[in-house]
């Protein structure tokens, strides 16, 4: 539901509410009822907009914090066949640059519900200096293991950027493998290899290692910390704190709320049916080359 729809629902709520309470003779009661019901209908519309939305704060060495607002919503879904088409959108504020990411994806659930197979495509646009790119990606996920691969294609060419410097969005790729920490189903480790193709200069490449934890007592909060290990140059440490604005009340999320920190089995191989709307793991910031240095928007 978009903002226009929320406004229309709220607007229509007023006359409908008046009809509901027209028999009430008390004008104060009528006024209070109209206000209460209008607020309730607005809250219902607002909550539905943020059913699967999250806010992330990222801090890293040598850079100001950045903020990301991201949402994932279904386009079409066939539960009987176990497939889903979805939309993922986000907006990022980093280093006084705003980047918008718009993507669509398709996911298929395996017959035993233990695996998700997915493909996706995105368009990224940084409106401050008009950089843009496309990407295609693929993913394979279970509750204990996952692999994510993305290929990025710059399409905007040279731009006049900050302080009059020439900037370019870069092509690149990343391949990431993730796995559950044995006996701790709320924790995962990730290792990612990436490379960005330098324009008339050396490529920028390296690896990223991170640990992600979902607190069992607070399933709407995720903490991920790690380091970006450059083949050349100074490594960068980072911490991401993500808050899910709307949990939606799904069964899997309720289960996460009460799951134990330590499990009886080394790896938790559970159904992935309720994970079909998890976000695509990708590099949402456009990697920019300025004065022959890849920054980010950066790596």
Language model regions located:
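Outer membrane beta-barrel translocator domains of Type V secretion systems
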Residues: 26-126
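Solvent-exposed loop/turn segments connecting transmembrane beta-strands
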Residues: 57-67, 91-101, 125-132, 197-207, ...
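Flexible, glycine-rich linker and terminal segments associated
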Residues: 23-47, 155-190, 196-201, 216-224, ...
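A charged, solvent-exposed segment within the mature domains of Sec-exported extracytoplasmic proteins
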Residues: 135-167
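Gram-negative bacterial Sec-dependent N-terminal signal peptides
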Residues: 1-22
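Residues on the lipid-exposed face of transmembrane beta-strands in outer-membrane beta-barrel proteins
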Residues: 69-73, 102-106, 121, 136-142, ...
């Amino acid at each position: 539901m978009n903002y226009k729809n929320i406004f229309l629902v709220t607007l229509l709520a007023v006359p409908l509410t008046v009809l509901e309470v027209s028999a009430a003779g008390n004008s104060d009661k009528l006024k209070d009822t109209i206000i209460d019901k209008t607020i309730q209908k607005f809250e219902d519309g607002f909550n539905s907009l943020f059913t699967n939305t999250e806010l992330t704060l990222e801090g890293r060495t040598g850079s100001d914090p950045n903020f990301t607002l991201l949402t994932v919503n279904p386009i079409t879904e066939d539960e009987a066949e176990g497939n889903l088409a979805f939309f993922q959108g986000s907006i990022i504020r980093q280093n006084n640059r705003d980047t918008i990411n718009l993507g669509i994806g398709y996911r298929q659930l395996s017959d035993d519900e233990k695996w998700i197979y997915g493909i996706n495509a995105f368009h990224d646009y940084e409106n401050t200096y008009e950089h843009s790119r496309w990407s295609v990606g693929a993913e394979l996920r279970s509750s204990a293991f996952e692999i994510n691969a993305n290929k990025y294609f710059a399409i905007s060419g040279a731009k006049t950027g900050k302080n009059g410097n020439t900037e370019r969005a870069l092509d690149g790729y990343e391949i990431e493998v993730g796995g559950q920490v044995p006996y701790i189903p709320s924790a995962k480790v990730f290792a990612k290899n990436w490379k960005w193709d330098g324009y008339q200069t050396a490529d920028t490449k390296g690896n990223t290692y991170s640990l992600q934890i979902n607190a069992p007592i607070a399933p709407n909060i995720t903490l991920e910390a790690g380091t970006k290990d450059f083949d050349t140059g100074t490594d960068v440490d980072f911490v991401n704190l993500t808050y899910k604005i709307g949990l939606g009340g799904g069964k899997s999320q309720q289960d996460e709320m009460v799951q134990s920190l330590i499990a009886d089995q080394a790896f938790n191989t559970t159904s992935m049916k309720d994970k079909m709307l998890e976000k695509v793991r990708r590099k949402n910031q456009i990697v920019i080359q300025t004065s022959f240095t890849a920054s980010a928007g950066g790596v």
